[in-house]
């Protein structure tokens, strides 16, 4: 389900809708909250939030961090393990498109962590 299929998603909305249909959606939210917490950023997202709510919260958090606290933003990317070379290739001419692309990369990476942990634990 994951390794090759994750490439078929074009944006975070498509990815989140698929994840929400999966039993691991709440674990994705828990992992996101944990990763942001490790960077001392309080990401307030309920495990019962909808994919749209989650996407909006992540977009707002990332945009806020880019504009006000670049060190925490970079720390979050490091903790989540988003490749720096991919981040550097994103077009920065429009902040909203940039944020959407970064959120998509974050969600893909965290989803991989959650999926692999669920598949290979037990």
Residue ranges: model-predicted function:
Residues 87-122:
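Amphipathic alpha-helical binding modules
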């Amino acid at each position: 389900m994951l390794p090759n299929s994750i490439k078929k998603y074009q944006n975070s909305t498509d990815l989140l809708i698929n994840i929400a249909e999966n039993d691991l959606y709440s674990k994705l939210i828990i992992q996101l909250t944990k990763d942001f917490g490790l960077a001392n950023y309080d990401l307030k997202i309920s495990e019962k939030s909808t994919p749209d709510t989650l996407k909006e919260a992540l977009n707002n958090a990332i945009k806020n961090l880019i504009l006000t606290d670049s060190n925490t933003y970079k720390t979050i990317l490091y903790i989540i393990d988003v490749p720096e070379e991919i981040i550097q290739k994103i077009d920065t001419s429009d902040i909203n498109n940039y944020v959407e692309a970064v959120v998509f990369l974050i969600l893909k990476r965290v989803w991989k962590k959650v999926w692999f942990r669920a598949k290979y634990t037990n």
